[in-house]
A protein has these predicted regions:
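Extended amphipathic alpha-helical scaffolds
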Residues: 10-56, 60-66, 241-302
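Short, Lys/Arg-enriched N-terminal segments with co-localized hydrophobic residues
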Residues: 1-10
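Mobile "lid/hinge" segments at catalytic clefts and subdomain interfaces of large enzymes
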Residues: 150-270
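Structured core elements
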Residues: 15-19, 26-28, 40-43, 50-52, ...
Length: 302
């Protein structure tokens, strides 16, 4: 599909509403952020978050995967404007940074090894009600935005918060603020239908068996959300984008692996200064003796 076809695809509004674990959700694309590679408005209750994903067309010469995630909080989402002398929005809060990391952890492993195109994900709360927190749904929004734009992301991915009812002892998926007030567990778990990539937990001295049961239940909940996301993407019918993979020379790993025993011995030195000196000396020796001058000039000393 050409650029015009892709633009027409983004202009078609697609909405998928569903109920899971006693709460109402919605995924929507095609109306906002049409210039982005992919965009999704995800809603739980009356809380809405716009998540956009922009993927560069050209591969960058980085030695890492250049993925950036931002969670941009806006006062208007809770019906307020900034007070004081400065009326502009402030820098990202600590909470915003933590939410961005929550999105990064399940998203980053989903891209293929050697993928070097820049990817920028921005989650912006549009509306935040008094009961439904906007953080966990950002992961589903990021996953849906990437896949709706045809990015090479191995999704869907989702994130859930697991609480436990003080009255019935049953687990609660994405509990409201009121439900969390009496919960003795707050487990945040993210991943795909096949694996877990992030776990954060706080609890009031619950047993290991209960924590394991909560994690198992959370994985099942993630799988259910991924299934709903797949149904949404079937309506979007995205066109996969073309991309290239940076493949490293396999002989590099072989040359480095030949010195694993020496590196292991150096790391076992109890003296920190001596240990670091041995490691640096071994690295310099490997670079000098096992790599040509042309390779060092091309790849750098690191």
């Amino acid at each position: 599909m050409g650029q015009a076809g892709r633009e027409r695809q983004h202009m078609t509004k697609v909405t998928h509403e569903f109920d899971l674990f006693g709460k109402h959700y919605a995924l929507e694309s095609g109306e906002l952020a049409k210039q982005a590679t992919g965009a999704c408005v995800v809603r739980q209750g009356d809380s809405e978050v716009l998540v956009t994903a922009v993927v560069s067309k050209e591969r960058k010469d980085f030695d890492f995967f250049p993925l950036t995630v931002d969670f941009i909080e806006k006062m208007y989402a809770v019906g307020r404007i900034p007070g004081g002398y400065l009326k502009r929005e402030a820098k990202p809060s600590d909470h915003g940074t933590l939410v961005a990391r929550m999105v990064d952890r399940p998203i980053r492993p989903g891209f293929p090894d050697g993928y070097k195109n820049e990817v920028h994900i921005v989650a912006t709360p549009l509306v935040i009600d008094e009961e439904h927190l906007p953080d966990t749904i950002c992961v589903a929004g990021a996953s849906a935005a990437l896949l709706a734009g045809g990015a090479p992301f191995d999704g869907p991915a989702a994130c859930v918060r697991i609480g436990r009812s003080a009255e019935t002892g049953e687990f609660i998926v994405n509990p409201t603020v009121t439900e969390m007030e009496t919960s003795d567990l707050e487990l945040t778990i993210a991943g795909t239908a096949d694996y877990i990539s992030m776990v954060e937990a706080g609890a009031d001295e619950i047993s290991e068996e209960d924590m394991l049961a909560a994690m198992t239940f959370g994985q099942e909940a993630i799988a259910a959300f991924c299934e709903k996301q797949s149904a949404f993407l079937a309506k979007v019918n995205p066109t996969p984008m073309t991309y290239t993979i940076h493949a490293a020379d396999p002989s590099v790993a072989e040359r480095v692996d030949a010195h694993l025993a020496e590196m292991s011995a150096a790391l076992k030195d109890a003296d920190k200064a001596a240990r670091m000196g041995k490691v640096e000396q071994l690295k310099a020796s490997i670079i000098e003796n096992d790599f040509t001058e042309e390779e060092r000039a091309t790849w750098g000393s690191d």
